[in-house]
């Protein structure tokens, strides 16, 4: 049995203390309405790789729910119009995008030391915008949801893709040595 989410919706980019998470196990009562995987031929597919937050976060996207699964749903007609048949989503599972501890040095201090150690900044952790790290693979990222139920919103997005005969592919990152 795997959790499909966690109680409480975190604010994207806000540091969270490493505390026990309360898992949510939603029922399987989602109405897929006879939804079927489009099964498109790869040689006839036009793929578009996107980041949920990055695709619709800017005001120029003109969506109501910026940076969310619902925001992508608002842009599906546009994607279909330009000929996209398949969207590959960069990690959409729950992951911590911020470190537990935040370094308090000024940006001038950071810039001054950036040239040392080949550009690496020992002791600094940056925002994990992309999500390529270990995570909770069965739980859609709550910060990518416009509403409280990220699992429901993600399922609705997949269903909207399929209504347009569009496929959705998910990327996952599994750290070296992880037993998968």
What is each stretch, according to the model?
Residues 44, 83-85, 164-166:
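Short, well-ordered coil/turn segments that N-cap beta-strands
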Residues 1-47, 57-61:
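The feature marks proteins involved in alpha-glucan
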Residues 74-93, 124-125:
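Catalytic domains of carbohydrate-active enzymes, especially glycoside hydrolases
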Residues 90-97, 172-180:
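Short, solvent-exposed turn/loop segments enriched in Gly/Ser/Thr/Pro and often Arg
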Residues 46-48, 87-89, 168-170:
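Hydrophobic faces of well-ordered beta-strands that scaffold small-molecule active sites
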Residues 34-40, 73-83, 158-162:
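Short amphipathic alpha-helices and their capping/turn segments at secondary-structure boundaries
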Residues 61-63, 68, 99-159, 163, ...:
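Aromatic- and acidic-residue-enriched carbohydrate-binding clefts of CAZyme catalytic domains
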Residues 50, 79, 89, 137, ...:
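Conserved, mostly hydrophobic/aromatic
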